[in-house]
Curated annotation (Swiss-Prot):
UniProt xrefs under HAMAP family: Phosphoglyc_kinase
Protein name: Phosphoglycerate kinase
Gene3D superfamilies documented for this protein: Phosphoglycerate kinase, N-terminal domain
Recorded GO MF terms: ADP binding; ATP binding; phosphoglycerate kinase activity
Family: Belongs to the phosphoglycerate kinase family.
Gene name for this UniProt entry: pgk
GO cellular component: cytosol
Organism: Ruthia magnifica subsp. Calyptogena magnifica
Entry superkingdom: Bacteria
Ligand binding (ATP): K197, E314, G340, G341, D342, T343
Lineage, highest ranks first: Bacteria, Pseudomonadati, Pseudomonadota, Gammaproteobacteria, Candidatus Pseudothioglobaceae
EC nos: 2.7.2.3
Pfam families: PGK (PF00162)
Length: 391
């Protein structure tokens, strides 16, 4: 990746506009999870230390575009930033005409999606954002797969467009995994449907040594082996695709599973061989023998990419597979990277964050990178670094 890096620039007295991912959960006007906010702090501190005028922008939630509302306001984020930075971070509601501020100050611009044209990457809106700054910093990997005004358009027209430390670190870690992985390379792809992860499965099958499937996805592969999956979530129309993937790549399909009769927290768990699932069963986790097999694979791996749980880990009786898998990844000597919302929830739940080498902040962006797709927000930074002029 050849882009301009924030760390290489003189920020003194400059107007620095930083696009961050501050899309956090909020309840009763209080931030309930501040991980993304804390992840943004080093970049902010770098700019403040150099005496820049620091403007932050982010989206939050899915408001009706162009219609400001308290429900999706970033005010609670500004409050939490003020606490973490030990300085006042004011929320700027009317910011498109420029922000009056002093060197060494930081303001948070209200939700970018309150501006009509944000999602459509409107050129006029992008130019107005660009006029606000001397330097635009893209530091939100989680939105890098979206070509929107605050992630892409502004980078076309800002005097300087660069990558922040968070984005650079993310791309470096993912590049390490995909470009020159230590072998054997193992990928775990979980989730409910093959159809939503089909491109990822196809892309990874070409580069990994073993492809582990979990969750509802695994049911389609079990069915592809000719076994009954009962009432389990299964995409029978994709069985031919599952068979092809198994021909192209080593895919250890579960040999035993944990079933229930209904999807509920109180459902009774029954462990069965994959060959013995009855018509009224629903598969919710992998069984103990399959867990042992996966733990051994993790132990011997050189590189691990983890995207998605292997069972319904929200219900304790169906959580053993994901719990044991997570701990096996944590204990492995392999270089490990985890990404995706459900995956990160599992990492949190089992307290293994410090033992995963890299935790990706992106959901959709993480998947699209694994698919080999070009991320628009990164591509525009590369174009600007190479001298392409959009003015």
């Amino acid at each position: 990746m050849s882009v301009i890096n924030l760390l290489d620039l003189d920020l003194s007295s400059k107007r620095v506009l930083i696009r961050q991912d501050l899309n956090v959960s909020i309840s009763n006007w209080i931030v309930t999870s501040d991980k993304r906010i804390k992840a943004s702090l080093p970049t902010i501190k770098i700019a403040l230390k150099q005496g820049a005028k620091v403007m932050l922008m982010s989206h939050r939630g899915r408001p009706i575009e162009g219609e400001p509302s308290d429900e999706f306001s970033l005010q609670p984020v500004a409050d939490r930033l003020s606490e973490l930075l030990n300085t006042t971070v004011r929320l700027e509601k009317d910011w498109l005409n420029g922000v009056q501020m002093n060197n060494g100050e930081v303001v948070l611009c209200e939700n970018v999606r309150f501006n009509a044209g944000e999602m459509a990457n409107d050129d006029n809106l992008s130019k107005r954002m660009a006029l606000m700054c001397d330097i635009f910093v893209m530091d939100a990997f989680g939105t890098a797969h979206r070509a929107q005004a605050s992630t892409h358009g502004v980078a076309k027209y800002a005097p300087i467009a660069c990558s922040g430390p968070l984005l650079s670190g993310e791309l470096d870690a993912l590049g390490k995994v995909l470009d020159n992985p230590k072998r054997p390379m193992v990928a775990i792809v979980g989730g409910s449907k093959v159809s939503t992860k089909l491109t990822v499965l196809e892309s990874l099958s070409k580069i990994v040594d073993q492809l582990v499937v979990g969750g509802g996805i695994a049911n389609t592969f079990i069915a592809a082996q000719g076994f009954n999956v009962g009432k389990s979530l299964c995409e029978h129309d994709l069985i031919p695709m599952a068979k092809k993937l198994m021909e192209d790549c080593e895919i250890p399909v579960p040999t035993d599973v944990v079933c229930g009769k209904e999807f509920s927290e109180t459902a009774e768990a029954q462990t069965k061989a994959s060959t013995e699932v009855s018509d009224d069963d629903m598969i919710f986790d992998i069984g103990p023998e399959s867990i042992k097999q996966l733990a051994k694979i993790m132990e011997n791996a050189g590189t691990i990419v983890w995207n998605g749980p292997v069972g319904v880990f929200e219900f304790e009786q169906f959580a053993s597979g994901t719990k044991t898998l997570g701990k096996a990844i944590a204990e492995s000597d392999a270089f490990s990277i985890a990404g995706g919302g459900d995956t990160l929830a599992a990492v949190d739940k089992y307290g293994i964050e410090d033992k995963i080498n890299y935790i990706s902040t992106g959901g959709g962006a993480f998947l699209e990178f694994l698919e080999g797709k070009i991320l628009p927000a990164v591509e525009i930074l590369e174009q600007r670094a190479s001298g392409v002029d959009f003015a």
